[in-house]
């Protein structure tokens, strides 16, 4: 649950963007790794991915509790992948944030020696 101070809507949007990125990678991971591991390990991976769906649902509940004025366009913040077609302007913004996050995460950083 969120803390006593409402989380900023931007925090929820960023979290949703990262969840989409995670789901995109997770689907690819399941497809690729699933070819080289046992059925038992594939099931473990699938359970982990389904656990993320529960986390997304809880985060969405928190977002609407913290921001009850939001329109139904915000129901897509935590759902979909980076490959999804945008379903609303809010969805489009989250997709842009997800792609920006992917760029940030995969860009090498200079680490001082």
Please identify what each model-predicted range represents.
Residues 12-13, 23, 48, 77, ...:
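Generic detector of intrinsically disordered, low-complexity, polar/charged segments
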Residues 8, 39, 88-91:
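Alpha-helix initiation/capping motif
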Residues 4, 23, 35, 43-44, ...:
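Context-gated lysine
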Residues 35, 39-84:
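Short, charge-rich amphipathic interface segments used for partner binding and complex assembly
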Residues 2-32:
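N-terminal acidic leader/helix
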Residues 63-113:
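Amphipathic alpha-helical binding modules
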